[in-house]
Amino acid sequence: MTQIINITQSKVISEQILRHVFRHRRLISDTEPCVHQPCSLCLAPHLEKVQYFVEHNEPIHFILPAFPAKSPNTQKVLGTMPDMGEQVSLKFLQSLCDQISEIYAPGAKLTICSDGRVFSDLVGVTDENVTLYGQIIQALLKEMKADAIDVFNLEDMYTDLSFDEMRQKLVKLYGQTIEAIKDAVKNNDHQCQMFNGIHRFLVEDYQVLEAHKSRNKIRLECKTRAYEVIQRSNAWSVLISELYPHSVRLSIHPQHYHSEKIGIHMIKTLDQWGTPWHNATVFDGKEFMLMKRSHLESMGATLVCQNGHPSYFAWTEQPLETRITVQEVI
């Protein structure tokens, strides 16, 4: 497509787009001035990619590895199906793309690179549940008319292999050695924080899945799994970067200020790591937020169903009409 604006104009527009996206950044730390006023180093890893699309008058393309499958830990989540947490998050992503079109007419597109198939066997999720979860995500996107969002997953890449063979091929072609990952975790603060976050999730889940085992044994086994999750997740990142070389990389994990990935908040959380697939959702009368299912039940929150399925919690003191009109909020 022919360029229609000059480089100076494209840089100004691209910076406006990035600063808008940065309003929703998920950061490792919130103590630096960059939290409120992103600096040139914050913009630098992404500016050229955004400019590529602006200079070609094309929608900005974001890629987001996310929406894998629900955690198998029913102390955290309501079940295996997407619920209000996923609905709110998908609507946020569509809204973000729509908002960008107010800054830049071609707008934005976003590809969810669903990574559930990549490491489901490591996190205690069956391939059947990954498939069901993905099908419902697609149905929600269609129901919402979320035309800016599409989904890519591992079976789109390797159509003629079993799920186990897909995972093996991914690691063989794109994976680092476990030794290299251990070295990175040992010597890089961000990699160490990532490992600790993944290890914590795994320990929480396997304490429920394998309650007959000691905590020490579970922690040790989950260390091995955490390294493999990182190995496959990194391999997935390399693959999608190869497929989408110009695209802007979003992440559901918190990132450093000047990272090559933009950590993104899709829904209110109590911590930096919360996601809809590791939590339940509660409506407080004004907005939705993520909390562990067990915490909400212990606090007396009321379960609300949609179409016969558990969807979210609401505080019991909220008037009934608030719950009835909850769809207006999202």
Curated annotation (Swiss-Prot):
Q: Does the keyword Lyase apply?
A: yes
Identify the domain of life: Bacteria
Name the record gives this protein:
L-tryptophan isonitrile synthase AmbI2
Q: Which family does it belong to?
A: Belongs to the isocyanide synthase family.
- Species whose genome carries this gene: Fischerella ambigua (strain UTEX 1903)
- Which InterPro entries does the UniProt entry name for this protein? Isocyanide_synthase_DIT1, PvcA
- In the UniProt record, the gene name given for this protein reads ambI2
Enzyme Commission number(s) of this protein: 4.1.99.25
Query: What PANTHER family does this protein map onto?
Result: SPORE WALL MATURATION PROTEIN DIT1
Cited Gene3D superfamilies: 3.30.60.140
One GO term in the molecular function aspect is: lyase activity
What keyword terms does UniProt attach to this protein?
Answer: Lyase
Task: Cite any additional comment in the entry.
Answer: AmbI1 and AmbI3 alone are sufficient to generate Z-3-(2-isocyanoethen)-indole from L-tryptophan and ribulose 5-phosphate, but AmbI2 and AmbI3 are not, suggesting that AmbI2 is functionally redundant in vitro.
Catalyzed reactions per annotation: D-ribulose 5-phosphate + L-tryptophan = (2S)-3-(1H-indol-3-yl)-2-isocyanopropanoate + hydroxyacetone + formaldehyde + phosphate + H2O + H(+)
Function (record text): Involved in the biosynthesis of ambiguines, a family of hapalindole-type alkaloids. Responsible for the synthesis of the isonitrile group on tryptophan using ribulose 5-phosphate as the source of the carbon atom.
